[in-house]
């Protein structure tokens, strides 16, 4: 009996000394990469899309309330809601694929952020359109706003409507904006109509990820995790390239100086983008992309990525544009080289490509 107990104890000790233990860090394997990718979708991509939709609906509700009581207090609420919407967009803009970018001509991202299309600031086009609609006679119904071209709608149009008076003066003084709305009843119809359309576009993205993507019977989440993408590319490659392209766009198109010029929210947008990228890379306590890189022997690369993100935060906090530009470019490079190399991913991109 004693010998039997001793043998059992020895076997138990030996079994505890072999294989992986519960507290061991995950190894860089295909299964763990797939698990990290699932976490990325469920804890980063879809939450970013949902948060943007939620804030779009909040902004839409605020426009209705503002137009029911046009005063400076409600204007402040309206502008604050737009600021939050803009920041949420920069979280989601890292993931410009799937439902957000599923049409060569009418991709939803173009109707949300026209600057992303080719780096053109369409503010004067938007101003002219608003002036024409205020004095026009066309029916400002749902169909009208659904048919608006990308360069006359979206976040930019809502910023112009929320932060300045129409007409040649383009005053940013709150009392002037209030007077402009009071004197031009159609302006509230323009505001609420465009807000409703943006919320509809945000909803399309969430529905595509969670319920049904285009003509497929499956949500994009399922298609993405099963590696059944529209263009035949690899899912992890698509994710990494999407983030890299957003970083490239931020510098190449001078987003810091060309975006959100009326609200002054561009720095906040950059902060939102970096917050999201860190969430994506760090994952959770079970598995993360950076953790898998460390497990694969790329600790130096991980340290470099984390240092760059920290420096970007310093640049944002101190409003150091030169430092920000330099380190956004560094992080762009990390997504081209260190991160895919550390995850054993072939990107297949031309490093000279831009947005």
Model feature map: region roles:
Residues 1-2, 151:
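Generic alpha-helical segment signature
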Residues 18-22:
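Bacterial signal peptide processing site
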Residues 14-16:
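C-terminal motif of bacterial Sec signal peptides marking the signal peptidase cleavage site
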Residues 23-355:
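Mature extracytoplasmic or organellar-lumen-exposed domains after removal of signal/transit peptides
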Residues 2-9:
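Sec-dependent signal peptide recognition
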């Amino acid at each position: 009996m004693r010998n039997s107990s001793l043998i059992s104890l020895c076997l138990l000790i030996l079994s505890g000394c072999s294989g992986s233990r519960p507290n061991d860090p995950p190894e860089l394997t295909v299964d763990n990469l797939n698990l990290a990718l699932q976490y990325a979708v469920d804890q980063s991509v879809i939450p970013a899309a949902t948060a943007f939709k939620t804030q779009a609906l909040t902004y839409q509700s605020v426009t209705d309330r503002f137009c029911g009581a046009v005063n400076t207090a409600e204007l402040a609420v309206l502008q604050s809601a737009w600021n939050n919407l803009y920041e949420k967009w920069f979280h989601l803009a890292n993931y410009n694929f799937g439902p957000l970018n599923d049409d060569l001509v009418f991709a939803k991202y173009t109707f949300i952020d026209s600057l992303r299309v080719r780096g053109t600031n369409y503010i004067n086009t938007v101003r002219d359109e608003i002036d024409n609609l205020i004095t026009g006679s066309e029916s400002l119904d749902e169909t009208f706003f659904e048919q608006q071209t990308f360069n006359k709608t979206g976040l930019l149009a809502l910023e112009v409507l929320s932060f300045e008076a129409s007409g040649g003066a383009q005053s940013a003084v709150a009392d002037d904006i209030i007077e402009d709305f009071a004197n031009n009843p159609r302006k509230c119809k323009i505001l609420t109509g465009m807000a409703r359309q943006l919320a509809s576009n945000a909803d399309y993205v969430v529905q595509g990820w969670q319920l049904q993507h285009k003509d497929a019977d499956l949500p994009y989440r399922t298609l993405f995790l099963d590696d059944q993408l529209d263009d035949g590319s690899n899912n992890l490659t698509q994710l990494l390239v999407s983030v890299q392209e957003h970083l490239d766009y931020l510098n190449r198109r001078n987003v810091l100086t060309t975006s959100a010029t009326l609200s002054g929210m561009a720095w906040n947008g950059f902060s939102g983008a970096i917050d999201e990228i860190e969430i994506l890379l760090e994952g959770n306590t079970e598995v993360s992309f950076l953790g898998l890189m460390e497990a694969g022997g790329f600790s130096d690369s991980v340290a470099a990525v984390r240092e760059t993100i920290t420096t970007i935060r310093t640049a944002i906090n101190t409003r150091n544009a030169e430092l920000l530009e330099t380190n956004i470019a560094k992080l762009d490079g990390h997504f081209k080289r260190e991160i895919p190399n550390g995850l054993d991913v072939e990107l297949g991109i031309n490093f000279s490509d831009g947005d």
